[in-house]
A protein has these predicted regions:
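N-terminal active-site segment of His-dependent metallophosphoesterases
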Residues: 1-43, 52-60, 69, 134-135, ...
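A short, polar/proline- and glycine-enriched secondary-structure boundary/capping micro-motif
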Residues: 83-87, 131, 158-168
C-alpha cells in the first residue's frame, strides 16, 4: 500500500469502527485492500472496472444480501444512476427488486430514494471524484428489522487538498443533503 494511502487509512478505520459488515462497491485494485478491511469486519465486494488483476473468491459481479429483513443489491457500475429504478433493475439486476442498491464506479457520492428503493453510491474514501489521493466519503447503513437509515459522511480534509464530498442522511423516507 502506498505510504500516502496508509496515512489516510486510519480515517477509514475510524469510520468503520463500529460496523458489522463492510460493503465494497468495486475498484478494489488489490486484494490486500479486502484483507485490511476484513481485519475490521466481514467484507462483501463487487468487481470494479479497475480490478482487472483482482482474482478473489470474496468478489463477484453482483452481490445480493438479506440483512434484518432488507434486500441489498450491489453492483459496481449502474449508469446512468438517475435512470428510472425499474429500468436499472431490468438492466443490471435481472428485474429483481431490492430495498437498497449499493453502487460505485463514479467515485461521486450519491444517495437517492425513489420508488421505494434506497440507492447509495458512497463515493470513495481515498479517491473522491477521481481526484488525486485524499480523504473522501463513506456510506453507513443502519439496518434493524423494520428500520433503514443511512448516511454518507466526509472523512475530513487531507492537508493541502480539500475533501470535495457532500454529506447526506436518509431517515427512512427522505434523503437530506447536509452541505
Amino acid at each position: 500500500m502506498p505510504a500516502e494511502l496508509k496515512l489516510l487509512w486510519d480515517e477509514v478505520r475510524l469510520a468503520f469502527a463500529d460496523v458489522d459488515l463492510i460493503l465494497h462497491s468495486g475498484d478494489i485494485v488489490h486484494p490486500m485492500v479486502l484483507d485490511q478491511l476484513e481485519a475490521w469486519a466481514p467484507v462483501v465486494a463487487v468487481i470494479g472496472n479497475n480490478d482487472v488483476y483482482v482474482r478473489d473468491d470474496r468478489v463477484a459481479l453482483t452481490q445480493w444480501l438479506d440483512v434484518d429483513g432488507f434486500r441489498i443489491a450491489m453492483v459496481h457500475d449502474m449508469e446512468p444512476e438517475d435512470e428510472p429504478i425499474d429500468e436499472l433493475r431490468r438492466k443490471y439486476l435481472r428485474g429483481e427488486r431490492p430495498d437498497v442498491i449499493v453502487t460505485g464506479h463514479t467515485h461521486y457520492e450519491r444517495m437517492d430514494f425513489r420508488d421505494g428503493v434506497l440507492q447509495v453510491n458512497s463515493g470513495s474514501p481515498v479517491h473522491p471524484h477521481l481526484w488525486s489521493t485524499r480523504l473522501g466519503t463513506v456510506a453507513l447503513l443502519d439496518l434493524e428489522p423494520g428500520s433503514l437509515r443511512a448516511k454518507i459522511v466526509k472523512l475530513g480534509d487531507t492537508e493541502g487538498r480539500r475533501n470535495p464530498g457532500v454529506e447526506y442522511t436518509f431517515d427512512g423516507s427522505t434523503v437530506h443533503p447536509l452541505d
